[in-house]
Swiss-Prot record:
Signal peptide: none annotated. Its EC number is 2.4.1.227. It catalyses: Mur2Ac(oyl-L-Ala-gamma-D-Glu-L-Lys-D-Ala-D-Ala)-di-trans,octa-cis-undecaprenyl diphosphate + UDP-N-acetyl-alpha-D-glucosamine = beta-D-GlcNAc-(1->4)-Mur2Ac(oyl-L-Ala-gamma-D-Glu-L-Lys-D-Ala-D-Ala)-di-trans,octa-cis-undecaprenyl diphosphate + UDP + H(+). This is UDP-N-acetylglucosamine--N-acetylmuramyl-(pentapeptide) pyrophosphoryl-undecaprenol N-acetylglucosamine transferase. UDP-N-acetyl-alpha-D-glucosamine binds at residues 12-14, 198, 289. It comes from the Bacteria. GO terms for molecular function: undecaprenyldiphospho-muramoylpentapeptide beta-N-acetylglucosaminyltransferase activity. It comes from Streptococcus equi subsp. equi (strain 4047). GO terms for biological process: carbohydrate metabolic process; cell division; cell wall organization; lipid glycosylation; peptidoglycan biosynthetic process; regulation of cell shape. Pathway: Cell wall biogenesis; peptidoglycan biosynthesis. Belongs to the glycosyltransferase 28 family. MurG subfamily.
Amino acid sequence: MTKKIIFTGGGTAGHVTLNLILIPKFIKDGWEVHYIGDDKGIEHQEIKKSGLDVTFHAIATGKLRRYFSWQNLLDIFKVGFGVMQSLFIIARLRPKALFSKGGFVSVPPVIAARLLGVPAFIHESDLSMGLANRIAYRFATTMYTTFEQEQTLAKLKHVGAVTKVTGPGSRSVTSKQLEAVLEYFDPNLKTLLFIGGSAGARVFNRFITDHPELKEDFNIINISGDPSLNELSWHLYRVDYVTDLYQPLMEMADLVVTRGGSNTLFELLAMRKLQLIIPLGKEASRGDQLENAHYFTTRGYAEQLLEQELTLPHFQEKVREVFAKQSDYLSAMKSSSELQSPESFYQLLSADISSATKEN
């Protein structure tokens, strides 16, 4: 009988990336893979784009808000309907396990899995749990965490950051597209790379547009998320989205200016890239990026600049500070033991699934 596993998670790329890393490993080992998500969400787009042999099952999903809104009443019914749909899907498929990467869409499948006696494994990327994972934790078999947690909860298992990004200098920059970029860059200048999430990138895009004088002192790479900004000109390369070019562009950068999303932060740690973190504040998020940034700065991996302090003089001062202490940051990153390869995490997850199914 073919072993089956269900993945869930979505809403943002960060809630899909790890799933896309793990799914090929399960397929290679003969598993039949299914995915529960929102058919209008990024998870559906990414699964289709991947070309992986995965059956996608769409469910209703509602946003879980931390504040009062009349929409909460409607979304309670959506979540409830999503649980009913998930119960039907999971009961029909009878999988050995469910793996969740979080996001609002993941809550109904995790609840349904628990009700049907299917082991549910969750991964939390941030220093503190989001609301979806706080709810899902109650129904989970195990929650894997990227960060060391101060709270001691029975079902938590710290595994570090799972990243497929390889170490520094492991790829050569040889593509024609990159060669074209290098023709516009000055080899005598430092290269800054700006990268933010879908919403977080807008502040960086505006900052670069408002301060063309940056190009006098630096080569600028701007991963903008906005195709209307695409440009290759004197000391400036703006591109909306990258896949194969992601790590080569990172290798080109002397310093990466980023938001505080944990996936990107740990990828930069794996590559030992100098980082200036400008996290989303509490007015635009639940404050998880501020916590992530604090974690990285206190361990000597990066420098932080708050968004409300993002002026050209402050930015230039912080950049100078990072370069002045470059050896300290690189030494701290080199001695870090917070990373785990996808293969080792897959082996751990497989062993935990086997153990949980034997107990059942």
